[in-house]
């Protein structure tokens, strides 16, 4: 065991061995808070362990096989990812099952329940509509078309109105720190490559009644590309269509074909301008 002190309180960490089946021995990390810590009075006589183990769970929904994985012991409220479309991209809205709550992926409403540490699948008494599959927004697939009016009154018809262009859809908000941190990188790419066919469309996740603030923000930050704003926060229609659950969320799209050319892995950071140049050079 090792002790570490901070702020007059001491925490102990150690490890132990567990006898497993078939004569195997496992190791588990343990820790204990200072029994004099007033913030954790309920844990003063409790020895805790790190959940450094997990389980793979396979099950069938209406005869179709699915699987998921979770770490530690199962419990009600645990969120499990089920890769419904097998593309390896996680959708927190359309591919998540919460243990103890009903869900419908295939036509029948089910519920996962935990009884004495065992997870079981049951048919739910509550009937829900089928959760639609998430859009397959991976490189090589097509983006979702849309038509909206920008904050400045410009009619945006995407991708139809961007023939011959390379377009970056930028889902962001004025309250989003990581989004703001990316603005200099987007500006650098736009300033460098706009005349060569690079376009940006901003989709704001700002709240209701903030249209003037968004206009003021983009003017002050010198962001000349069109901005789409509905004032619906996380329920903005394009966010729902594109299954956006975190921002910044970005996609690079061929305006002529609608094909997705790159996702966030290539579209963030100071290397954005160079990457856009590479894409344009191959057209």
Please tell me what each predicted stretch does.
Residues 181-221, 231-240, 274:
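Structural microenvironment flanking redox-active thiols in thiol-disulfide oxidoreductases
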Residues 157-177, 186:
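Short active-site neighborhood of thiol/selenol oxidoreductases, capturing the structured segment around
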Residues 163-164, 195, 223, 244:
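Active-site acidic short loop of glycosyltransferases
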Residues 221-223, 230-277:
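Thiol/disulfide oxidoreductase modules built on the thioredoxin-like
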Residues 142, 165, 245-247:
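Short, small/polar residue-rich loop motifs at catalytic or cofactor-binding pockets
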Residues 1-149, 156-162:
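Calcium-binding acidic motifs and repeat modules
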């Amino acid at each position: 065991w090792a002790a570490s002190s901070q702020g007059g309180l001491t925490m102990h960490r150690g490890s132990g061995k567990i006898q497993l089946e078939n004569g195997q021995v496992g190791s588990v990390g343990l820790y204990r808070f200072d029994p004099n810590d007033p913030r954790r009075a309920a844990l003063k006589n409790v020895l805790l362990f790190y959940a450094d183990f997990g389980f793979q769970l396979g099950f069938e929904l209406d005869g179709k096989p699915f699987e998921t994985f979770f770490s530690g012991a199962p419990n009600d409220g645990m969120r499990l990812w089920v890769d419904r479309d097998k593309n390896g991209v996680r959708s927190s809205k359309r591919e998540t099952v919460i243990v103890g709550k009903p869900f419908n992926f295939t036509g029948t409403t089910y519920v996962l329940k935990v009884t004495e540490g065992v997870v079981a699948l049951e048919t739910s008494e509550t009937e829900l509509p089928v959760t639609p599959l998430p859009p397959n927004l991976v490189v090589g697939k097509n983006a979702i078309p849309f038509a909206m009016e920008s904050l400045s009154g410009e009619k945006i018809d995407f991708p139809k109105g961007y023939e011959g262009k390379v377009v970056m859809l930028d889902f962001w908000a004025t309250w989003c720190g990581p989004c703001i941190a990316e603005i200099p990188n987007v500006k650098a790419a736009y300033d460098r490559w706009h005349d060569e066919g690079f376009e940006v469309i901003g989709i704001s996740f700002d709240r209701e009644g903030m249209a003037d603030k968004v206009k003021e923000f983009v003017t002050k930050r010198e962001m000349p590309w069109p901005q789409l704003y509905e004032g619906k926060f996380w329920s903005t229609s394009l966010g729902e269509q594109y299954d956006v659950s975190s921002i910044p969320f970005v996609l690079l799209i061929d305006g002529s074909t609608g094909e997705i050319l790159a996702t966030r892995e290539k579209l963030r950071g100071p290397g954005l301008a160079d990457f856009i140049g590479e894409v344009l050079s191959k057209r």
